[in-house]
């Protein structure tokens, strides 16, 4: 995914000519990989921070397949590894393209919410395509009106979230609520935890 990461970050920088702090969650990047990323972004006002994640924190418990790698769960450790000066931030999957300025989006008022995200209204995450665990959890009385969001682009209220959530909390939800049988792994966990505190963009 290194190539995709470089393309995504280049599109971000091209359309947002300001200083950007980039935090990259990883467990296997080599010095050569890191240098390639830095070379790719050399002409932009970017500072790259590498946040190492221990793969063993997730391996052996969380569902993976050809589509869902273990790295998909790394965002569940963000609140544990980010420096204390980070108040809000975007989370981006690497398979996106930024095609315009994000200034207005970045400065949106959270109105007390943990997240700002976009509704996921296609694929397997809509009621008519729910699998058994989705039907059980998102079809429950508490969540049946929940508008499921896509976790590939998130504006995160880090200042608020770090006082309530951490890796252990999210993993507890994976175990106690989902029995590790998520259908859209980390995205299901985030939708369950933040279903009352996500503003749809």
Language-model features and meaning:
Residues 1-200:
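Glycosyltransferase catalytic domains, chiefly GT-A lineage
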């Amino acid at each position: 995914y290194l190539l995709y990461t470089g393309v995504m970050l280049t599109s971000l920088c091209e359309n947002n000519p300001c200083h950007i702090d980039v935090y990259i969650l990883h467990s296997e990047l080599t010095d050569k990989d890191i240098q390639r990323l830095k070379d790719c972004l050399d002409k932009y006002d970017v500072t790259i921070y590498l946040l190492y994640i221990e793969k063993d924190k997730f391996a052996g418990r969380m569902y993976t397949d050809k589509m869902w790698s273990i790295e998909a769960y790394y965002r569940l450790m963000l609140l544990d590894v980010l420096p204390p000066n980070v108040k809000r931030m975007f989370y981006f999957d690497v398979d996106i393209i930024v095609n315009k300025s994000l200034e207005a989006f970045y400065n949106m008022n959270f109105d007390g919410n943990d997240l700002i995200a976009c509704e996921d209204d296609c694929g397997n995450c809509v009621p008519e395509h729910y699998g058994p665990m989705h039907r059980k959890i998102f079809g429950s009385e508490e969540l049946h009106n929940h508008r499921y969001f896509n976790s590939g682009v998130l504006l995160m209220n880090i200042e608020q979230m770090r006082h309530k959530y951490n890796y252990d909390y999210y993993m507890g939800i994976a175990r106690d609520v989902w029995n590790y049988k998520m259908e859209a792994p980390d995205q299901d966990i985030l939708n369950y935890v933040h279903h009352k505190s996500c503003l749809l963009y």
